[in-house]
Every structure is written in structure tokens, then in C-alpha cells.
């Protein structure tokens, strides 16, 4: 018989840097999950990723306080900031442009994010990423 699910916890955890401090500790502690067990397992699984890369993680907590987790690809904004070399997006989206990004760069990001996006093909995924770039205050150029 399958284990009964107690709940889900969604966190954005830096790759290879899970520690019992907030926000991880309190979120897992409320559900009675072994915090150090999660941190060790997460850090072991994300060894190959670049240290500090934010990874959206969904933790499934079962009634017997055991857990499983799934990591997803880093957020589109992380890839966009890396491609353009930004620290943060525009504070005045639509009025202030902070940089430029090419369609080729958008397509490359879309290919990396494809499995986590709700899109049927790379073109649709690129349009989703383009929307994120525009909302960060970036100008999309053809070259």
C-alpha cells in the first residue's frame, strides 16, 4: 500500500548549500521531517550543479515523517541574468531598459528549461522566456 502524503513543501534551495537554517529548517521542522537528513541528501544529489545555483525543490512529506524530493531546473530569471550579466532586473519595467538579450540566447535558455515549462515546442518555450525577459526590463534584439 502506498504511503499517505502529509503535504508538499516548495522551496528554492541553493545547489550544494542546503543548511538547517531558515528557510529550510523551519519549513521542514513544522512537518516533523529530519532536517539534517534532507540537507545531506539534497547536497549529495546536487553536487554536479554549480554551487549556489537556486533550484526550485518540491518536497513530498509522508505521514510517517519520511520524505522524497524533486529538483527542477533553475528559474528562467537566473539564466537570463547570467546570459546578460545582470545583478537584478529593472525596478521600472516598461519605462527603464537595463540591457539587451538576443533571440538566440532566449532559445538557448528555453531549451534548458523545456522540461519544466508548459510548452509543446521550443518556439513556445522561447516566447515564455521572452515574456520573463521583458518583465525584467530587457530589450529583445534579433541579432
UniProtKB/Swiss-Prot annotation:
**Highest taxon of the lineage:** Bacteria
Q: What does this protein do?
A: Forms part of the ribosomal stalk which helps the ribosome interact with GTP-bound translation factors.
Q: Tell me the NCBIfam families matching this sequence.
A: L11_bact (TIGR01632)
The subunit structure is: Part of the ribosomal stalk of the 50S ribosomal subunit. Interacts with L10 and the large rRNA to form the base of the stalk. L10 forms an elongated spine to which L12 dimers bind in a sequential fashion forming a multimeric L10(L12)X complex.
GO molecular function ontology, one term from the record:
structural constituent of ribosome
Q: How is it modified after translation?
A: One or more lysine residues are methylated.
Cross-referenced InterPro entries, in alphabetical order? Ribosomal_uL11 (IPR000911), Ribosomal_uL11_bac-typ (IPR006519), Ribosomal_uL11_C (IPR020783), Ribosomal_uL11_C_sf (IPR036769), Ribosomal_uL11_CS (IPR020785), Ribosomal_uL11_N (IPR020784), Ribosomal_uL11_N_sf (IPR036796)
* SUPFAM superfamilies linked to this entry: Ribosomal L11/L12e N-terminal domain, Ribosomal protein L11, C-terminal domain
GO biological process terms on file: translation
Q: Name one GO cellular component term.
A: cytosolic large ribosomal subunit
**Which key words tag this protein in UniProt?**
Methylation, Ribonucleoprotein, Ribosomal protein, RNA-binding, rRNA-binding
Q: What is this protein called?
A: Large ribosomal subunit protein uL11
Intrachain S-S bonds: none
Similarity annotation: Belongs to the universal ribosomal protein uL11 family.
Record the organism. Phenylobacterium zucineum (strain HLK1)
Amino acid at each position: 500500500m502506498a504511503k499517505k502524503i502529509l503535504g508538499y513543501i516548495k522551496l528554492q534551495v541553493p545547489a550544494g548549500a542546503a543548511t538547517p537554517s531558515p528557510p529550510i529548517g523551519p519549513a521542514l521542522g513544522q512537518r516533523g521531517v529530519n532536517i539534517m537528513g534532507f540537507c545531506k541528501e539534497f547536497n549529495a544529489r546536487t553536487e554536479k550543479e554549480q554551487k549556489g545555483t537556486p533550484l526550485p525543490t518540491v518536497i513530498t512529506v509522508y505521514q510517517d515523517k519520511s520524505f522524497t524530493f524533486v529538483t527542477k531546473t533553475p528559474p528562467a530569471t537566473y539564466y537570463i541574468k547570467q546570459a546578460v550579466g545582470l545583478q537584478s532586473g529593472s525596478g521600472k519595467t516598461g519605462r527603464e531598459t537595463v540591457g539587451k538579450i538576443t533571440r538566440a540566447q532566449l532559445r538557448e535558455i528555453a531549451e534548458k528549461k523545456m522540461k519544466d515549462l508548459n510548452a509543446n515546442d521550443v518556439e513556445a518555450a522561447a516566447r515564455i522566456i521572452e515574456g520573463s525577459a521583458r518583465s525584467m526590463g530587457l530589450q529583445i534584439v534579433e541579432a
